[in-house]
Amino acid sequence: MRYQGGKARLAKTIAPILGGGGTLVSLFCGACNVEALATRNFENVICNDNHPYLIAMFKALQNGFEPPDVVTEEQYKYLKANKDENPALTGFVGFACSFGGRWFEGYARDGNGGNYALSGKRSLIKMMPNLRNVKFICSDYHDVKLPDGCIVYADPPYNGTKQFQNKKFDTDEFWRYMRLISEDHIVFISELHAPDDFVCIWEKQVTRTLDRNKDNYFKATEKLFIHQNNIKRLQQTNDE
């Protein structure tokens, strides 16, 4: 499913790096591309996101919800104005059928005649067997209970972008909290940049575009960080 900042192309590489075993907690699950693959390696996976319509969609999918094959621009505008009429459908349309996968930022059109609703539906149906037993919760990331010994994965909004309800993401507070929970857990953070006390353990250059129908591609380097105090703990875990 189209989702701004989703890790669809990188999930197969990132998921194995997270390791396996007991419980994985994802603080910003988004489109769940990484999490869907990580379920193969962990006994339990908890997926959190503070976007209620996104979580409503995933919970409904677990219970048999089937997204539509086609969403017209009129239907798109209606759901944008009446979000609570069908939260699961709103969650699907708000991302899968929006320009750039950005929450209701304009009805997506493909100059080549592509069907964004059908494409999003197919990708979700393909991943749902892996997400069938995932626990989905909707909360601020600070409020997510972290089980003892769990692995934490954080893929926060890009610096400067807005969250649900147009609240700007506080990057400084995010890194402060990552330091705090790194005292008791191995925490992996997907980001482009990090403070000096966080170590990059993996990186890959990717090509992005603001609009696939225009010639505005640019390069970015996706990275995976852990706190410097977690390096020895991670090495010990990998040696076990």
Task: List the predicted regions and their residue ranges.
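Short, polar loop motifs at secondary-structure junctions
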Residues: 29-33, 121-122, 190-195
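Short His-Asn-centered micro-motif
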Residues: 27-29, 48-49, 137-139, 154-157, ...
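Hydrophobic "anchor" residues on beta-strands that sit immediately upstream
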Residues: 22, 45, 151
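Active-site segment flanking the S-adenosylmethionine/decSAM binding pocket
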Residues: 135-171
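Short loop/helix-cap segments at secondary-structure boundaries that form the rim of catalytic
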Residues: 37-40, 144-148, 193-202
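Long, positively charged, glycine-interspersed low-complexity recognition regions
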Residues: 166-240
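S-adenosyl-L-methionine
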Residues: 1-36, 40
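Class I S-adenosyl-L-methionine-dependent methyltransferase module
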Residues: 41-138, 142-143
